[in-house]
Amino acid sequence: TLPANIHNFFRLIKTKVKFMNDPIEKLKSQKNSVEIKGMKSAHLRDGIALTRSIYWIKNKVNTQQLTEIQAVKKIDDNRLKNKKFHSLSFPTIAGSGPNGAIVHYHATKKSNRRIKDTDLFLIDSGGQYLDGTTDVTRTISFKKVSKEQKKMNTLVLKGHIAVATSKFSKSETGKSLNTNARKYLRQHDCDFDHGTGPVSYTHL
């Protein structure tokens, strides 16, 4: 990719620019056998850490007051216990109720909200391990959800299944897959204002 300001500079000095695909990008998009194995291992151990965190959060919500910042600390601490853990993929996001709807929300002392069992609770987090990197999002309900929440979750799930079962050619771009992910929501005049899914990559 060429930054826009550099492209504009070449235009100003009237130099012709030939655009071509970056060969490195193609290599980066194709995982070799070592990367695939590492990715699977990293997701397995990360899943264990996240499952322990969610179990702890569900128990604490029912027995005592728990805040978003406390939940973030527990999630991060459980990842930190693994010997192959290197760092977080990005700062852990934990949003309760309306905070869960804020894209890339991060709890601060001012915004820190008590996690209520009547609200949906969103976790978006990941870890960098020596053999792979994770990025996982989970929406948790502590009690029975409303009809509207159930409907929205079902529409998102249908989009996920549509992408997972798509058959596409080698030359096809992600644009059509993105459309598949959103089509059931759009049928109900709904959408989401962020990317469809995370990037899967190897520990850098």
Residues covered by each model-derived region:
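Active-site neighborhoods and metal-handling regions in enzymes and metal-associated proteins
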Residues: 1-204
